[in-house]
Amino acid sequence: MSKQPDRLFSQPLEQVPDFVFNEDVVRVFPDMIKRSVPGYPTIVENLGVLAARFAQPGTALYDLGASLGAVTQSLRRHVRSDGCRVIAVDNSAAMVERCRQYLTAQDSMFQELLPVQVLEADILALPFEPASVVAMNFTLQFIAPDQRLELLGRIRQALLPGGALILSEKLRFADEQEQDLLNELHLDFKRANGYSELEIAQKRSAIENVMKPDTLETHQERLRAAGFSKVVPWFQCLNFASLIALP
């Protein structure tokens, strides 16, 4: 499947609409996220490696906010526990349709992959099966802040002893100087990947009302409040990080 370059915000828009994961975004999403999120390929590949340590035979592995299924593909490449299956969930019909196409292509290239179920659903209303691994890769930041604790609490209840939640998020920082520095470095990263000042400004306008990052401290406190016993940051690149939360 051909991957198109992200030019969604390359032309001046009279009014910049809020960002949505529609068909236009789906077409360019692999290019967009690679050029926008520092360390993204490293996070995705190692999510599978981490999951292999925590996956337990006969359990569900969740990819919540699966988008095009990059994390699901990583889980299927690395996890070998008997009887496991991946449940990939996204609320965007366009994402789900393309995700299924990518996973079908993966099935044609590899043997003995974990079975996968792709659901178009709202994770806030999703009943969770007993799970040994739950991955949320840049998903929680799009959930309304007042609904995040309840969601994490339900995930904690579904996690089996010895399992793990792997949570990746964009961070904000309480220290103003630290926030300004890492924000500017992130903008430099985007410029180095070919985004113009117009594209950067219009994308920021589109996403600022729908994505609400938290501080690392807020994530840690919320995860503990949800019932997790240990929170371990395992990766950070600029203002993007990933955590392992243990039940």
Curated annotation (Swiss-Prot):
Keywords: S-adenosyl-L-methionine, Transferase. S-adenosyl-L-methionine binds at residues 40, 65-67, 90-91, 122-123, 137, 204. The keyword S-adenosyl-L-methionine applies. GO terms for molecular function: carboxyl- or carbamoyltransferase activity; S-adenosyl-L-methionine binding. It comes from the Bacteria. It catalyses: prephenate + S-adenosyl-L-methionine = carboxy-S-adenosyl-L-methionine + 3-phenylpyruvate + H2O. GO terms for biological process: tRNA wobble uridine modification. Its EC number is 2.1.3.-. PANTHER family: CARBOXY-S-ADENOSYL-L-METHIONINE SYNTHASE, TRANS-ACONITATE 2-METHYLTRANSFERASE-RELATED. Homodimer. Catalyzes the conversion of S-adenosyl-L-methionine (SAM) to carboxy-S-adenosyl-L-methionine (Cx-SAM). Belongs to the class I-like SAM-binding methyltransferase superfamily. Cx-SAM synthase family. This is Carboxy-S-adenosyl-L-methionine synthase. It comes from Pseudomonas putida (strain ATCC 47054 / DSM 6125 / CFBP 8728 / NCIMB 11950 / KT2440).
